[in-house]
Design a protein with these regions (language model features):
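C-terminal lobe/tail of nucleotide-utilizing enzymes
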Residues: 172-239
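Inter-motif core of Ras-like GTPase G domains
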Residues: 123, 137-160
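N-terminal phosphate/diphosphate-binding loop that engages ATP/GTP or pyrophosphate donors
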Residues: 3, 19-94, 98-102
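Short internal beta-strands
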Residues: 39, 155-158, 183-189
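Short, structured coil segments at secondary-structure junctions
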Residues: 60, 150, 208-210
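Phosphate-binding/switch loop-helix module in NTP-utilizing enzymes
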Residues: 80-136
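Hydrophobic anchor at the beta1->P-loop junction of P-loop NTPases
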Residues: 8
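Conserved glycine(s) of the Walker
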Residues: 15-16
Length: 239
């Protein structure tokens, strides 16, 4: 089976999805896979400077045009649907699906936030609507829906410390309900702390979910050394 890439999602905001995504991209590049990156939506950014998307592109070593790397960029730091509607715009999932389908190399798709974050509104098809309820309305589409459409192995990034057991278990359950392939849960340390739960959380997440769990590694302050350390952490995903 051809290796197509990964769909990276978080269990929460601020868990370090982009860090893990960069590490995976860099590892794929090291293997000579010439990876591509796709951040479908980035919010809280200037339209010409989506920082997370550009960081992914740099790790890939690619020269993707900005509109293929990050087709939707919004200034408001909010969920994609909220940010889009604040600007009177909409996110077209068919455009995103097309970018993945046309990719000629493994692609890493980084979601904006967690699995249930709202991305867009789509009209209900006629067979989804009860005529007694009146004309068709719209349904909210989430990152989980996008993951289901793309059918890429999912890398779920969670915080290393307190609170991660519940977040990871709920996210894994959501993936299982859609029969989506979970490549791994990656527990990431985003700051130095003395949280006593860090040492055992990986074992508990594995026991509770049955998922493959990577990490957490030690926190590394230096950005370059941190990328190298995370690259070693995710090496088993790529080889």
């Amino acid at each position: 089976m051809t290796f197509r890439g990964f769909f990276v999602a978080g269990t929460d905001t601020g868990v370090g999805k982009t860090e893990i995504g960069r590490a995976i991209c860099a590892r794929m590049a090291l293997r000579g896979l010439h990876p591509l990156a796709l951040k479908p939506v980035e919010t809280g950014c200037e339209p010409d400077r989506p920082e997370d998307a550009l960081a992914l592109r740099e790790a890939c070593g690619s020269s993707q045009p900005l509109d293929e790397l990050c087709p939707y960029r919004f200034r408001l730091p909010a969920a994609p649907l909220v940010a889009a509607e604040a600007e009177g715009r909409r996110v077209d999932l068919l455009r995103i699906e097309g970018l993945v389908q046309r990719a000629k190399a493994p692609i890493l798709v980084e979601a904006a936030g967690g699995l249930m974050v709202p991305l867009a509104r789509e009209p209900l098809s006629i067979d989804q609507v009860d005529p007694a309820d009146g004309p068709p309305s719209a349904v909210i589409v989430t990152n989980l829906d996008l993951a289901e459409r793309l059918q890429l192995p999912v890398v779920l990034v969670g915080r290393a410390g307190l609170g991660t057991l519940n977040h990871c278990a709920l996210s894994v359950e959501a993936l299982e309900q859609r029969d989506l392939l979970l490549a791994a849960v990656v527990l990431n340390r985003t700051q130095p702390d003395d949280d006593p739960t860090v040492a055992s959380n990986a074992r508990w997440v594995a026991e509770m979910t049955g998922a493959r769990v990577l990490g957490p590694g030690p926190f590394v302050a230096d950005a370059r050394q941190r990328l190298l350390a995370l690259g070693e952490l995710v090496a088993r995903l790529v080889g």
